[in-house]
Design a protein with these regions (language model features):
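Terminal, charged accessory segments of proteins
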Residues: 1-228, 238-259
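Acidic-basic catalytic patches of nuclease active cores, encompassing PD-(D/E)XK
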Residues: 16-41, 268-300
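Solvent-exposed, charged helical/coil patches
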Residues: 227-284, 289
Length: 301
């Protein structure tokens, strides 16, 4: 089904209340989603009325059951050319840190009507497939275990605590493992989008990829902490684009996007317009003026 496309400040409502109509059941789910996530508060992304809502201050996509509502800027991205508005929208996003690639060039013929959220999921899947084809990176993981043999360094305090009678050794050692931070983050992202995507092709690919990550342990891991520890080098540089996209899905609130999931019935991806245009204009200025001049985007203070 083709997405429903509206611009900022255009009404979305039940039949007869707006130019863009959805059925009453989906409209009520959307209102509940907005209220639950406080999207009608600060920052105010919606004005909510009895029979219609008005999206504002953001661009993005909302999926309700089997339909997708896409919100584009109030100002036209391409003059008198509706067919290329998504392409221009994605071109703007490439100037945002998370999407600092030519993502709009990946908008293949036949995918023009793919919802934005599914498009990002598809891009992430494609990057992970490249990594699997090249080979998952291994790294040394520090472990502390109570084992039957000497390996590494004896952890004497824990050895005394746990092994007064048992014929074991509490050892601290490094193990060359597939449970690298990079692989753990990719698996966490795959597990999350598995519960979000409604595109049959995407979900099929996700399940196939998760088989490749079956031996990777992610229980109890905090993606926020893992991302802070990631350092790129020649060994893992090819993970960078996929991890940027994984961050978009896993951290829910990055500086440039807000992502919500409500029991899979309603999902939304939102890009605050103020932040998007600040980043876009700053990067355009860098291209136009002397590269020796430093340009910084203002912070929230």
């Amino acid at each position: 089904m083709n997405p429903i496309v509206v611009r900022e400040y255009e009404k979305i409502g039940i039949k007869g209340a707006s130019k863009t109509d959805i059925d009453k059941n989906k409209f009520n789910k959307l209102k509940e989603f907005i209220k639950t996530n406080k999207l009608d508060e600060d920052p105010k992304f919606f004005e909510v009325y009895k029979d219609y809502i008005i999206p504002q201050n953001f661009i993005g996509s909302i999926n309700i059951d089997n339909i997708s509502i896409e919100i584009f800027p109030k100002i036209p991205l391409v003059k008198d050319n509706e067919n290329h508005k998504k392409e221009r929208f994605l071109e703007i996003l490439e100037y945002v840190e998370t999407f600092n690639e030519n993502i709009y060039e990946n908008l293949e013929i036949g995918n023009e009507n793919m919802p934005i959220l599914e498009f990002f999921i598809s891009n992430f899947i494609e990057e992970v497939e490249k990594i699997v084809k090249k080979g998952l990176v291994y790294s040394y993981i520090n472990k502390s275990e109570n084992i039957l043999y000497f390996k590494g360094k004896l952890d004497l305090p824990n050895h005394i605590k746990y092994n007064i009678i048992e014929n074991r050794f509490f050892m601290n050692f490094d193990e060359f493992s597939i449970n690298s931070m990079e692989n753990c983050l990719l698996k966490l992202a795959l597990e999350k989008i598995k519960n979000i995507s409604s595109n049959i092709e995407n979900t099929d690919k996700i399940h196939k990829l998760l088989i490749q990550f079956e031996d990777i342990e992610t229980s109890g891991l905090n993606p926020v902490h893992l991302f802070k520890k990631i350092l790129y080098n020649k060994k893992n540089e090819f993970y960078k684009k996929s991890l940027n996209l994984a961050k978009f899905f896993l951290l829910d609130e990055s500086p440039y996007s807000i992502f919500f999931n409500d029991k899979r019935e309603v999902t939304g991806v939102f890009f605050p317009m103020e932040t998007i245009y600040e980043s876009y204009i700053a990067n355009k200025l860098k291209q136009l003026i002397n590269k020796q001049i430093s340009i910084k985007i203002q912070d929230d203070s």
